[in-house]
C-alpha cells in the first residue's frame, strides 16, 4: 500500500471505517518496525478490533488488563453499529483509562509513537487513543554539576513528566501553568513552557510561544538545541538562557517571574531571561543567611575579574 505524504512531509488521510483498509494502511506505515506491537482481536463475532502500540514505551500490562481483557469479557446481546460500539466502550469499558478520539492518520501516528495505544474498531471512522505511556527512565538522583552542602540534593532526569512533577511539588499553586507542545519536525519532542500566571510578563510569554511554534528543525534531542534555536543574538558571548539541573533553582526562577522550558530527554531545564548576575549565584545561596550569600557572590564576581585579567 502506498503511503501519501504532503508537501510538509506529513501523512495525509483519515480513517475510512473499513477495518481491512485502515489496518492494512497502518501495517504498511509500520513495515519493518519490529518494536510496534499490532494485536488484532475480535469483540464477539460481529466486530474486529486491533490494539497498536510501541513496545517499551507503553504500559503493556495496562493495555491487557484494562483494555483488551474487559472487551473480550464483555457480553453483547445484539449486534450494534461501529459508532454505537465506540460510544458504549467509551462510557462503560474505559472508565479507568484516560482516552480521546482521533481520526486523522497524522494525529494517530503521533500518538502511537508517543507511547499511547490505538484501539481501532471495525465500522468506525474514529479511533480511541488510550493514555498508556510508560517511558524507560532512571530515578531521581543527586545532582552532578550543581552540588551543594545545604539544600535539596535531587536533580532533574531525562523524563519531562518527572521534571514537571519535581517543580509542581515545590510550587503547589494553581497559578503555576505548564503549556505542553511538540517540537521537531521528525522527532516530535515533548516540550513544556512553564510559568507563573500572575508573575510572568505577558509580552515575553507570547514571544516565547511564537518562537517555539516556529521552530523548524528535524530533531530536537536536548534543551541545548532549543536554546540555540531560540536565542536572539547568536554572536553574543553572554548566555541568554540559564541551564540548571536543580528543581529548586527552577522553582525560584519561576517565582521571580521567569519562564522555564522543559524538554523531554534533557536532564535539565532552561530558565529565561538570564541576567549576568544569575551566573554568580550558587544553589547554597538560597539556604544561607543573606549577608553570607551576598559576600560569597561578591567574591565570585571579583575572582572572575581576576581570572579574566
Predicted regions and their residues:
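Membrane-embedded alpha-helical signal segments
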Residues: 1-306
Amino acid at each position: 500500500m502506498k503511503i501519501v505524504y504532503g508537501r510538509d512531509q506529513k501523512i495525509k488521510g483519515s480513517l475510512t471505517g473499513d477495518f481491512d483498509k485502515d489496518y492494512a494502511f497502518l501495517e504498511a506505515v509500520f513495515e519493518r518496525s519490529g518494536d510496534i506491537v499490532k494485536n488484532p482481536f475480535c469483540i464477539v463475532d460481529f466486530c474486529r478490533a486491533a490494539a497498536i502500540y510501541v513496545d517499551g514505551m507503553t504500559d503493556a500490562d495496562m493495555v491487557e488488563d484494562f483494555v483488551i481483557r474487559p472487551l473480550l469479557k464483555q457480553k453483547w446481546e445484539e449486534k450494534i453499529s461501529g459508532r454505537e460500539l465506540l460510544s458504549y466502550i467509551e462510557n462503560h469499558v474505559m472508565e479507568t483509562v484516560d482516552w480521546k478520539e482521533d481520526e486523522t492518520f497524522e494525529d494517530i501516528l503521533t500518538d502511537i509513537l508517543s507511547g499511547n495505544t490505538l484501539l481501532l474498531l471495525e465500522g468506525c471512522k474514529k479511533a480511541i487513543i488510550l493514555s498508556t505511556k510508560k517511558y524507560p527512565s532512571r530515578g531521581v538522583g543527586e545532582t552532578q554539576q550543581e552540588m551543594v552542602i545545604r539544600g535539596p540534593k535531587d536533580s532533574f532526569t531525562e523524563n519531562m513528566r518527572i521534571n514537571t512533577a519535581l517543580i509542581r511539588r515545590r510550587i503547589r499553586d494553581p497559578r503555576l501553568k505548564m503549556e505542553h507542545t511538540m517540537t521537531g519536525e521528525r522527532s516530535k519532542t515533548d516540550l513544556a513552557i512553564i510559568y507563573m500566571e500572575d508573575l510572568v510578563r505577558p509580552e515575553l510569554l507570547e514571544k516565547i510561544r511564537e518562537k517555539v511554534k516556529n521552530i523548524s528543525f528535524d530533531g530536537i534531542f536536548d534543551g541545548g538545541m532549543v536554546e540555540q534555536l531560540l536565542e536572539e543574538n547568536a554572536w553574543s558571548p553572554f548566555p541568554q538562557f540559564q541551564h540548571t539541573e536543580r528543581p529548586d533553582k527552577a522553582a525560584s526562577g519561576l517565582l521571580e517571574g521567569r519562564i522555564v522550558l522543559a524538554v523531554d530527554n534533557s536532564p535539565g531545564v532552561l530558565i529565561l531571561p538570564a541576567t549576568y548576575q544569575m551566573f554568580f549565584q550558587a544553589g547554597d545561596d538560597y539556604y544561607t543567611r543573606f549577608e553570607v550569600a551576598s559576600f560569597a557572590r561578591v567574591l565570585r564576581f571579583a575572582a572572575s575579574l581576576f581570572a579574566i585579567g
